[in-house]
Amino acid sequence: MTFISSLRRAVARGIVVATLSTAALSTAALAQQGTPAPGPLVEAEWLSKNLDNPKVRVFEVSVDPGLYERGHIPGAVNLNWHTDLVDTVKRDIVSKEKFEALLEKAGVTKDTTIVLYGDNNNWFAAWGGWVFDIYGLGDQVKLLDGGRKYWEKLALPLDTRTPAPAVSDLTLSGPKTELRARLSDVLAAADGKNGTVVVDIRSPDEFSGKLFAPEGSKELSIRAGHVPGAKNVTWSKAVDPETGKFKSKDELKKLYADAGVDGSKPIIVYCRIGERSSHTWYALSRILGYQVKNYDGSWTEYGNSVGVPIANLSGTVWQGR
């Protein structure tokens, strides 16, 4: 072997080693920057290491929108469920055009990992996830498991500054009608005509008709009770009360299977206005992979409708107040 040949081989080996080293460093850097694990949830620890990741956009969707101003996850954009996720004139979800403009202002693209969180164990964050999914972004959306509750439990940072991300260009799809139940769907299920299981996720007292709505609620119905044939699995049974995190997949399967909900039939979930039921929708649809529609009209529509069948176990009668 000549000296020149040996030199060429040595140089080639060096280039290969350097290339492999660079690739290893790049892989390590990506791992540190963080691509979240596949699935519908992210952990607080992962998010805390990815707050500066340009491919991650965080949104707060809380029952109390004022929480955001008092302190939020650094870089998070506030979504007010009263105005940003609904039509403010007619009772409906936000239009595709308005939602598209809102997300472009927040810098969301087709490559963005969207992390949603909120108070009350992610009630309205899950509602947000449902709306995102309706407009074709479901695969990009993840809930921060445990929401604000677990983030604060870990004493992770909060900020009061409002971010100003670069405006993006985004085209939404949908709406995906297979994710949303209408009154006609619920009536067909109540009559046993569409082979669908209905799950009422309200409290036992609301389900039985003892209560028209939780104390302090402004959106009321003038009839109490539940959709005939509905299964009652209170939404909060799906979470760990100490952390606010979802129970394990096996625990969730057992919870719903014990109530006769095993994913073998299509499912409709409802509550009072659709926000608590979106949490159950997330558990059943995104975590367990069942075929589920959220009935966002829920009891404020059903319990105010004329002539619909109702099961009122408590016999409570509306007294006009």
Give residue ranges: language-model regions:
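Bacterial N-terminal signal peptides
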Residues: 13-28
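Thiolate-centered catalytic microenvironments shared by cysteine-dependent enzyme domains
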Residues: 94-193, 210-211, 225, 276-293, ...
